[in-house]
């Protein structure tokens, strides 16, 4: 729709229609015809105020206040942000698909390498999306080799955001439990740490050009954290060393699974985004030992260690796709390293275990009176172990027998079981249960005050 134009003549017409009785009764065409003759007889000085009013109205129309939502935010700004977010997500998906299809085109999809990264943080700024980092881990992964390399470091930011100490203590206490500054562990030179991280990421992409952006993957939960922590590290650097893009690892798993099935001629019938996303949500390798840093191993917080987090992501990829490509999983690369159990399970009822560990003579007796079957194992040098097997499905009891249900016979009769209107005639309306208290006699309430004998 073309913008509305203002001129001095129409301002004169509107004023004449508002201030004169004849103008209020006339329609717009009649007012234009009537005012046209007057406008022709007016000189430039007389037309000046109306031309000025037209210019002011045009300026005011350009400076109209934008529509706001209930939070006082501009609707146009929100729509623009939504469009930008949708465009970023579309670019992310296209780039992820391009990386996977490039490996498929080379017929080397199992050797295509990806970089996974995760941050732990102390606190988040309330005014922007900057996080104060506490720990960083990144690894290079491929389906064929598993975890190729890993970079991990604790971070000492030196100081926290003023006024957010309580929030920081609450967050760290319920997550990674790393010591707070000034007692924080790890690298304190943020500029050097950022340079080392960029150097490692570039080493994982030897074919990339110096000006190409670096692509790392993280879950949607960690994507804003990784972005905010990289912004914090970059702020202490003299100049930006690289452009780092953080993409969705869940979408990478979905696309990679589809291309793996297509490369081995397996028709996709069950793979969808919900199925692949649930693998990260369930986190089946969450409580495995030996995949986190030594500090979190000692305090038993392996679940929140970034080294453990990225390792579990790699294990999810391997567990979900190595079987399709006939890749033999290796402990520590495609699956958690094997751990010697620090406990012993003893089950005397397991006949196969008992017979394999020791030589024993097994006898079976049946008690006809009770219907119980008892297994007795006699072992030289050991005490006799007895285990009785009960058939809980075969149960019969008498509901009136006190020995089967002893609680039934222990119940006492309730006192004052007689109704309030026991001495009234059958037709008396006061025998009704809902008679108001004002219409009842004192005698009706006698039973209510009789206490049972102690």
Curated annotation (Swiss-Prot):
**Record keywords, A-Z:** Cytoplasm, Developmental protein, Differentiation, DNA-binding, Meiosis, Nucleus, Oogenesis, Repressor, RNA-mediated gene silencing, Transcription, Transcription regulation
UniProt superkingdom: Eukaryota
Q: Where in the cell is it found?
A: Cytoplasm; Nucleus
Q: Recall the GO molecular function terms of this protein's record.
A: transcription cis-regulatory region binding
The Low complexity compositionally biased stretches are 350-370
User: Where do the record's region annotations for Disordered lie?
Assistant: 336-374, 405-433
InterPro entries, sorted: HMG_box_dom, HMG_box_dom_sf, Maelstrom, Protein_maelstrom
- Is Transcription among the key words of this record? yes
What does the record list as GO biological process? germ-line stem cell population maintenance; male meiotic nuclear division; negative regulation of DNA-templated transcription; oogenesis; piRNA processing; regulation of miRNA-mediated gene silencing; regulatory ncRNA-mediated gene silencing; spermatogenesis
Tell me which SUPFAM superfamilies the record gives.
Answer: HMG-box (SSF47095)
Pfam families recorded: HMG_box_2, Maelstrom
**Is Repressor tagged as a keyword?**
yes
Q: Which GO terms describe its cellular component?
A: cytoplasm; nucleus; P granule; perinuclear region of cytoplasm
Please give the family membership noted in the entry.
Answer: Belongs to the maelstrom family.
According to its UniProt entry, the function of this protein is described as:
Involved both in the piRNA and miRNA metabolic processes. As a component of the meiotic nuage, plays a central role during oogenesis by repressing transposable elements and preventing their mobilization, which is essential for the germline integrity. Repression of transposable elements is mediated via the piRNA metabolic process, which mediates the repression of transposable elements during meiosis by forming complexes composed of piRNAs and Piwi proteins and governs the repression of transposons.
- PANTHER family per the UniProt record, alphabetical: PROTEIN MAELSTROM HOMOLOG (PTHR21358:SF4)
Q: What's the protein called, per UniProt? A: Protein maelstrom
The organism encoding this protein is Drosophila mojavensis
Q: What is the lineage of its organism?
A: Eukaryota, Metazoa, Ecdysozoa, Arthropoda, Hexapoda
């Amino acid at each position: 729709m073309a913008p509305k134009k203002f001129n001095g003549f129409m301002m004169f017409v509107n004023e004449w229609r508002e201030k004169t009785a004849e103008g209020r009764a006339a329609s717009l065409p009649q007012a234009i015809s009537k005012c046209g003759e007057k406008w022709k007889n007016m000189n430039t000085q007389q037309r000046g105020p109306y031309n000025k009013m037209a210019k002011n109205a045009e300026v005011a129309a350009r400076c109209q206040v934008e529509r706001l939502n209930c939070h006082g935010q501009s609707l146009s700004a929100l729509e623009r942000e939504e469009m930008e977010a949708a465009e970023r997500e579309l670019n992310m998906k296209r780039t992820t698909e391009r990386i996977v299809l490039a490996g498929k085109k080379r017929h080397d999809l199992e050797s295509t390498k990806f970089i996974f990264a995760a941050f732990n943080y102390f606190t988040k700024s309330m005014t922007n999306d900057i996080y104060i980092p506490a720990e960083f881990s990144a690894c290079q992964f491929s389906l064929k080799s598993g975890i190729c390399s890993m970079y991990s470091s604790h971070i000492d930011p030196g100081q926290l955001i003023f006024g957010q100490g309580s929030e920081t203590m609450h967050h760290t206490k319920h997550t990674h439990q790393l010591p707070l500054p000034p007692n924080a562990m790890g690298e304190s030179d943020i500029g050097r740490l950022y340079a080392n991280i960029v150097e490692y990421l570039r080493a994982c992409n030897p074919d990339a050009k110096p000006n190409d952006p670096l692509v790392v993957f993280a879950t949607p939960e960690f994507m804003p954290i990784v972005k905010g922590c990289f912004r914090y590290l970059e702020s202490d650097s003299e100049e930006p060393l690289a452009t780092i893009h953080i993409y969705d690892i869940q979408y990478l798993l979905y696309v990679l699974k589809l291309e793996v099935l297509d490369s081995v001629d397996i028709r996709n019938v069950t793979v969808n985004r919900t199925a692949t996303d649930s693998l990260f949500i369930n986190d089946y390798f969450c409580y495995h030992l030996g995949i986190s840093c030594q500090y979190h191993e000692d305090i038993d917080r392996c679940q929140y260690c970034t080294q453990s987090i990225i390792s579990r992501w790699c294990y999810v990829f391997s567990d979900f796709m190595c079987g399709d490509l006939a890749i033999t999983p290796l402990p520590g690369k495609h699956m958690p390293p094997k751990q010697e159990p620090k406990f012993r399970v003893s089950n005397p009822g397991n006949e196969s275990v008992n017979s394999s560990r020791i030589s024993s003579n097994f006898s079976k007796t049946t008690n006809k009176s009770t219907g119980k079957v008892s297994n007795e194992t006699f072992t030289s040098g050991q005490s006799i172990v007895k285990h009785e097997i009960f058939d809980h499905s075969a149960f019969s009891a008498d509901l009136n027998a006190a020995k089967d249900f002893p609680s039934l016979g222990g119940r006492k009769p309730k006192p004052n079981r007689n109704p309030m209107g026991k001495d009234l005639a059958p037709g008396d309306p006061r025998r009704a249960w809902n008679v108001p208290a004002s219409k009842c006699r004192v005698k009706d309430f006698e039973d209510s005050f009789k206490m049972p004998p102690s």
